[in-house]
């Protein structure tokens, strides 16, 4: 199983969109899960960008509040996430993108 931790994505929308496309391409080309984080107050912007930019069949795992009583770890396709939104504002979150 291969993965890459890429840290933070760009804050500016067009640069973030470009980076998401690059990461999705890497996930498919190398069967490599792409792991990234965001500052808690920008999580919702990143989440909305992910579901707007990625292909419907791409898988996204959202791991929130890890090791806290409010922990949630949810995986689904982008198509599933479009129907099942989540509130991530001010919550520590790790995002995982894979094929």
Residue ranges and their predicted role:
Residues 1-26:
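Class I SAM-dependent methyltransferase SAM-binding "motif I" and its flanking Rossmann-like core
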Residues 29-99:
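A contiguous loop/helix-start segment that scaffolds small-molecule binding in enzyme catalytic cores
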